[in-house]
């Protein structure tokens, strides 16, 4: 099981008028949940930036790879969220900040589904924090 969740979407900087502003200003409390429990729970997560990275990865990903490795422009820490091929179509899910050891790999399909659901929800819930032009651009990148 893998779930990418968020709540309390906000933008302390106001309405994003440019793409880079949407990537970094639209934040939420973010949680990665796996079978064992909460792998990662972070406030002020750049949800739009992660959605764009996931959308780009989904365009090229298959059961064999490549791995997904997310590092935010807003943080020096690398590997804030990653998915790595493990064996027999299974993938490991982790983070540099993970709160527990994730011993149960996820299927590629579970990861795809979790990423798609996350992107879809970000598209809906972040629109009010972007200008119409930026929202259209973000929608086309993540489509």
Whereabouts are the PLM-identified features?
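Charged, low-complexity, helix/coiled-coil-prone segments
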Residues: 1-3, 54-67, 128-138
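N-terminal low-complexity, intrinsically disordered segments
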Residues: 1-48
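A short, compositionally biased
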Residues: 23-29, 65, 85-90
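Compact, well-ordered interaction domains used in eukaryotic information-processing assemblies
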Residues: 43-75
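An exposed acidic His-Trp-rich patch
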Residues: 68-106, 110
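Mixed-charge, glycine-accented linear interaction segment located at domain edges/termini
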Residues: 97-143
């Amino acid at each position: 099981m893998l779930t990418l969740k968020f709540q309390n979407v906000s933008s302390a900087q106001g309405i994003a008028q440019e793409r880079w502003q949407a990537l970094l200003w639209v934040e939420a409390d973010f949680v990665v949940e796996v079978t064992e429990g909460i792998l990662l729970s972070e406030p002020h997560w750049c949800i739009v930036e992660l959605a764009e990275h996931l959308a780009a990865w989904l365009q090229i990903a298959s059961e064999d790879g490549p791995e997904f490795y997310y590092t935010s422009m807003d943080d020096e820490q690398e590997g804030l969220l990653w998915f790595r091929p493990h064996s027999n179509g299974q993938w490991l899910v982790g983070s540099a900040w993970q709160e527990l050891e994730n011993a149960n790999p996820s299927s590629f399909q579970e990861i795809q589904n979790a990423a798609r659901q996350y992107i879809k929800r970000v598209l809906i819930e972040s629109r009010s924090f972007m200008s119409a032009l930026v929202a259209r651009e973000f929608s086309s990148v993540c489509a």
